[in-house]
C-alpha cells in the first residue's frame, strides 16, 4: 500500500464533540479465561490516563495527549496531565503569526501537526500552564479563549494585518485571551522570547529550557520494540522521530498510515493494530463520525445508521484501547476479558474477524445526552461494519453537514498511527 499524506482535520470537517454548544472536531450541540493453571493476559493492557472532555474542535490534540500520557505512564508509573491548552495556544499562534487566520481560528489538525508543535514548543503539564484546570475534566478556558481570539480577529486588535505580522503583539493577544498569569507569561518569554525568536528545535538543541517547559527528548516514554520483542524505556522524541509534517523518520518513530481498500489489506492492517494493542502500545485512529450511528450503548453501528439515516458528520481522532474478535472456530474473545497467550495468537489469524475496536474518547466519561449504557465510561466501541462502511457522505453548508444532501460515500476509517516495526506488510 502506498503511504499517503496525513489527513487534515479541518474546522469545517471536524465535529466539536466535547461540549454541547460548540463546533470543531464534529460539532457538539450539547470469553472466558483459559484452562485452570494456564497464564492469562488481557487482550490489551494499555494503562490509559483519565478521560477528558474537549470543549472545542481540537480532538486531535486530546488524542495525541492521551497517547503521550500512556507512553509516559508505562515508563514512570505516574499519571501525567499533559496540557492540551498549551498545544492549542501554539497552534493558534502559528496560524495568526504566519498569516493563515484572517477572520476565524481553525481548531483542526492532525498527528503531523502535533508532532511539529512538540518539536518546536515541547509540552507543559496543565498545572504549569492553566493551574485552575489541572483537575478539570473539561477546559472552559479553551472555549473562552477561542471566542476572544475570534472576536479580536473580527473587531479587535487582530483585525489589523499589521498587528498579526507582529509576533510579540500576537502573543500578547493570546496571553490575554487565555487569561495567562504573569508567571506563565514569564516562563514563555524566558524560553521563546516575547516575539518567539527561539524554538526548542533550533535554540535548545543542547540545553534544557526549564521554566516548566519540557522538550520531547527529556520526557520519559516506554514503547515496545518489535524487532527485539522487548519493552524499551525511551524518550518521547524517539516515538515522534524527526522530520516534517508529511513524514517522520527514526528507528522507533510512529507513522501515520492510511486504511487500505481491499479486504485482504485491511485484515493485515487490523492485525498490525492488534499486535500493537497486545504489546500495550496505544494507537491513534482517525475516523469519520456520523452521530446517527451512535447507539445508547456507546457503539458506532452501521445498522443503527442505516435505520436512522445520515446525521451530523465530521472527522475525529481518538486512541485505541481494546478490541473484540471472533476466532476462526467461532469462539469470541470479548473486550476487557482475559485470554491465554495461545488465544491471543489465534486472534491474529487472517481468518479471525475483529468485531469492534474500543477507543478512549475525549467527550467526557458520563454523557447521558449522548449515551446511557457504556461498557466503559468515556470509551466507545467502533464496530467494524461501521469502520469499513461505506457510509453516505453529506455535503457541508456553513461548516455543518447537510443530512438531506449526501451524494457520495466514504469509508469511515481513515488512518492509524502505528509503531515502528509493524507496517512492513501494509506500506511502511
Place the predicted regions along the sequence by residue.
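Bacterial N-terminal signal peptides that target proteins for export
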Residues: 1-12
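Mixed-charge, low-complexity intrinsically disordered regions
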Residues: 231-260, 304-308
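Active-site nucleophile-adjacent alpha helix/oxyanion-hole segment immediately C-terminal to the catalytic cysteine
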Residues: 37-238, 243, 271-279, 283, ...
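Processing junctions and N-termini across compartments
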Residues: 18-19, 53
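Conserved catalytic-core surface of thiol
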Residues: 335-428
Amino acid at each position: 500500500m502506498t503511504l499517503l499524506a496525513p489527513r487534515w482535520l479541518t474546522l469545517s470537517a471536524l465535529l466539536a464533540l466535547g461540549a454541547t454548544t460548540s463546533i470543531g472536531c464534529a460539532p457538539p450541540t450539547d470469553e472466558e479465561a483459559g484452562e485452570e493453571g494456564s497464564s492469562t493476559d488481557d487482550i490489551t493492557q494499555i494503562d490509559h490516563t483519565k478521560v477528558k472532555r474537549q470543549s472545542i474542535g481540537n480532538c486531535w490534540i486530546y488524542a495525541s495527549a492521551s497517547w503521550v500520557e500512556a507512553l509516559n505512564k508505562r515508563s514512570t508509573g505516574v499519571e501525567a496531565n499533559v496540557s492540551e491548552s498549551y498545544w492549542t495556544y501554539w497552534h493558534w499562534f502559528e496560524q495568526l503569526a504566519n498569516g493563515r487566520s484572517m477572520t476565524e481560528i481553525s481548531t483542526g489538525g492532525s498527528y503531523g501537526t502535533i508532532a511539529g508543535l512538540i518539536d518546536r514548543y515541547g509540552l507543559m503539564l496543565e498545572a504549569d500552564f492553566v493551574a485552575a484546570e489541572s483537575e478539570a475534566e473539561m477546559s472552559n478556558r479553551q472555549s473562552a479563549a477561542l471566542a476572544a481570539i475570534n472576536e479580536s480577529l473580527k473587531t479587535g486588535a487582530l483585525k489589523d494585518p499589521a498587528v498579526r505580522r507582529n509576533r510579540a503583539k500576537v502573543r500578547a493577544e493570546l496571553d490575554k485571551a487565555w487569561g495567562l498569569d504573569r508567571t506563565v507569561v514569564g516562563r514563555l518569554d524566558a524560553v521563546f522570547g516575547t516575539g518567539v525568536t527561539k524554538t526548542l528545535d533550533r535554540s535548545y538543541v543542547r540545553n534544557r529550557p526549564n521554566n516548566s517547559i519540557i522538550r520531547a527528548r527529556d520526557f520519559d516514554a516506554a514503547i515496545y520494540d518489535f524487532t527485539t520483542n522487548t519493552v524499551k524505556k525511551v524518550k518521547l522524541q524517539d516515538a515522534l522521530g524527526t522530520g516534517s509534517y508529511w513524514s517522520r523518520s527514526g528507528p522507533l518513530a510512529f507513522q501515520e498510515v492510511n486504511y487500505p481498500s481491499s479486504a485482504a489489506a485491511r485484515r493485515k492492517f487490523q492485525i498490525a493494530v492488534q499486535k500493537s494493542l497486545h504489546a500495550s502500545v496505544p494507537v491513534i485512529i482517525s475516523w469519520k463520525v456520523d452521530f446517527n450511528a451512535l447507539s445508547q450503548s456507546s457503539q458506532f453501528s452501521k445498522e443503527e445508521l442505516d435505520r436512522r439515516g445520515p446525521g451530523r458528520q465530521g472527522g475525529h481522532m481518538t486512541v485505541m484501547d481494546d478490541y473484540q474478535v471472533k476466532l476462526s472456530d467461532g469462539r469470541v474473545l470479548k473486550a476487557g476479558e482475559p485470554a491465554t497467550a495461545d488465544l491471543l495468537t489465534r486472534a491474529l489469524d487472517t481468518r479471525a474477524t475483529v468485531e469492534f475496536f474500543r477507543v478512549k474518547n475525549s467527550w467526557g466519561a458520563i454523557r447521558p445526552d449522548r449515551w446511557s449504557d457504556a461498557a466503559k465510561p468515556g470509551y466507545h466501541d467502533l464496530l467494524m461494519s461501521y469502520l469499513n462502511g461505506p457510509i453516505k457522505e453529506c455535503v457541508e453548508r456553513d461548516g455543518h453537514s447537510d443530512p438531506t444532501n449526501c451524494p457520495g460515500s466514504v469509508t469511515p476509517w481513515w488512518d492509524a498511527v502505528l509503531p515502528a516495526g509493524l507496517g512492513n506488510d501494509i506500506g511502511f
